[in-house]
Amino acid sequence: MTLKRMDNVGIVVESLDTAISFFTELGLKLEGRATVEGEWAGRVTGLGTQRVEIAMMVTPDGHSRLEISRFLTPPVVADHRNAPVNALGYLRVMFTV
């Protein structure tokens, strides 16, 4: 099996509207917006029952997507912002502008 393309990157934010506005200014287009909730969604993430507002944005070339999430339940864990650069997990997403 070989990689064909990068499909999407997920980011959790405090304000979905602010994030959509920011990435729209950079040239991404809003592809869709929805609320995802229920036990089935919790099974995917391992968080149990959850309620999340999501927005899917697509890059101008149409090759990649940015999935922006705002968790309503369970509450977000905010202390990751003080994590050092070598902490496991998401660190950055880079775009050519």
Where are these regions (language model features)?
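Basic/polar N-terminal segments that are highly enriched at the extreme N-terminus
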Residues: 1-2
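Short hydrophobic/aromatic-rich motifs at helix boundaries and adjacent loops
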Residues: 26-28, 74-77
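Core segments of cupin and vicinal oxygen chelate
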Residues: 12-63
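Vicinal oxygen chelate
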Residues: 5-14, 53-72, 79-97
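A short, acidic/glycine-rich surface segment
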Residues: 38-43, 75-81
